């Protein structure tokens, strides 16, 4: 094992995560229908600052992300600063790393803390699958640009006369990889076939996810980290995630047909994460700054790793690649972890990554490592359920996982936790967090 790389500032401070909060996550076109991601981001950051009693001018930087970009607000981070009463002098910029976007936001703020350019910052992400950038055809787009440059009415009419009815149809956002044309579900089907994952195994994991998430809510474990949200017309509050099946039964999953490979597939809407709206954020500080303000951190960022692999085959193996690297940088092994939280984009993807982590052959032949990362202990794995149950607002999931894991570590008396996710483009992310 190579030498661990401690995440500390120039003054020797650890990177503290002092607060974390999220909105409830809502299925597409339900409670947050019509609420753009920027407003969800303002909602969660404003509430988090109000709850924390941290003066607004203490926050020197805000790094935020969204995956489904809205052209009218390309820098969501700056709009959140301007819309939440924070100091106008707060530095703010936006990031995007597909489903690992808020992992990237956290890493960026941590790097600013380590460089000494700031002492406190906010990281997070928001996405709306209900407010989408509906585009136009390439032909219509080109015609509109040319018409804007035309000098006479006759020139404009001539340009528009070339359009056909099909050119006027709206173009929804692409759901496939730009480079391959494959949908995420197609990749999940690939992985199920590559790793011999059955429909029964996928349905069982999805059922477990919903059961554990429902239990977590029932026992009140999530109430401190999820705000009550109101959406227009502001009559009914949303207090909990509305995707969780509180009375999940395994038989219900077996009724659904495959969603991607209709004839031979095993990936269904029930064993996949749904399109979701929501936002999540965390406040990071140097350890000494937290002490100055009298704040007790939720925990500390011990290490992180980002990886990238080919997109043509099994591209959602990011956790299997990034986890050993994050563990190595933290000076830990899988056995040292108290909790493991893996993003459940699809049950097939999750199960494939678990197989790879335990595989000696994968370690040797693919990763070039002498031994497997290790077999994941189910009693440590996604103990409060995962994204299949909670939902997945793309840019918000990482911040949800970090906050949720730190709270659960504290309930268990401390320890180390792994949070890890796959992402579009063959990307992977993993972070080791620590609570005392």
Curated annotation (Swiss-Prot):
Compartmental location: Cytoplasm
Reactions it catalyzes: an acyl-CoA + acetyl-CoA = a 3-oxoacyl-CoA + CoA
Keywords: Acyltransferase, Cytoplasm, Fatty acid metabolism, Lipid degradation, Lipid metabolism, Transferase
Pathway where it operates: Lipid metabolism; fatty acid beta-oxidation
Keyword Isomerase: no
Enzyme Commission (EC) number: 2.3.1.16
Cross-referenced SUPFAM superfamilies: Thiolase-like (SSF53901)
Cross-referenced Pfam families: Thiolase_C, Thiolase_N
Span of the signal peptide: none
Family indicated by similarity: Belongs to the thiolase-like superfamily. Thiolase family.
Subunit structure: Heterotetramer of two alpha chains (FadJ) and two beta chains (FadI).
Protein name: 3-ketoacyl-CoA thiolase
Lineage of origin: Bacteria, Pseudomonadati, Pseudomonadota, Gammaproteobacteria, Enterobacterales
């Amino acid at each position: 094992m190579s030498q661990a790389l401690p995440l500390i500032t120039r003054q020797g401070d650890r990177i503290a995560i002092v607060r974390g909060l999220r909105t409830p996550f809502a299925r597409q076109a339900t409670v947050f229908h019509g609420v753009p991601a920027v407003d969800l981001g303002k909602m969660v950051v404003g509430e988090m600052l109000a709850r924390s009693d941290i003066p607004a001018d203490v926050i020197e930087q805000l790094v935020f992300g969204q995956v489904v970009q809205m052209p009218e607000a390309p820098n969501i981070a700056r709009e959140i600063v301007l819309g939440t009463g924070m100091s106008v002098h707060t530095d703010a910029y936006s990031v995007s790393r597909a489903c690992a976007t808020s992992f990237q936001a956290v890493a960026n703020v941590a790097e600013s803390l380590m460089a000494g350019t700031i002492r406190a910052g906010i990281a997070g992400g928001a996405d709306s699958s209900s407010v989408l950038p509906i585009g136009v055809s390439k032909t219509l787009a080109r015609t509109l640009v040319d018409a804007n440059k035309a000098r006479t009415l006759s020139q404009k009419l001539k340009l528009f006369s070339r359009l056909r009815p099909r050119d006027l149809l709206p173009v929804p956002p692409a759901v496939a990889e730009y480079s391959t044309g494959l949908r995420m579900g197609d990749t999940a089907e690939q992985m199920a076939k590559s790793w011999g994952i059955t429909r029964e195994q996928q349905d069982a994991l999805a059922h477990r996810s919903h059961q554990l998430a429902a239990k977590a809510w029932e026992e009140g474990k999530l109430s401190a980290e999820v705000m009550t949200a109101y959406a227009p017309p502001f009559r009914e509050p949303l207090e909990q995630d509305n995707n969780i099946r509180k009375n999940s039964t395994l038989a219900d999953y077996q009724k659904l047909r495959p969603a991607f490979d209709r004839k031979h597939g095993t990936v269904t809407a029930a064993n996949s994460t749904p399109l979701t709206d929501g936002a999540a954020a965390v406040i990071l500080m140097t350890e000494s700054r937290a002490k100055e303000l009298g704040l007790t951190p939720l925990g500390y960022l011990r290490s992180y790793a980002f990886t990238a692999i080919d997109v043509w085959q099994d591209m959602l193996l990011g956790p299997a690649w990034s986890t050993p690297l994050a563990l190595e940088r933290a000076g830990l092994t899988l056995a040292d972890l108290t909790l493991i939280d893996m993003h459940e984009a699809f049950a097939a993807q999750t199960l494939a990554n678990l197989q790879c982590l335990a595989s000696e052959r994968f370690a040797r032949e693919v990763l070039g490592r002498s031994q497997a990362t290790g077999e994941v202990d189910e009693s440590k794995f996604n103990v409060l359920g995962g994204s299949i149950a909670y939902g997945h607002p793309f840019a918000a999931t990482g911040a949800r996982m970090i906050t949720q894991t730190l709270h659960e570590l504290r309930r268990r008396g401390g320890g180390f936790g792994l949070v890890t996710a796959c992402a579009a483009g063959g990307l992977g992310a993993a972070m080791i967090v620590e609570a005392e």
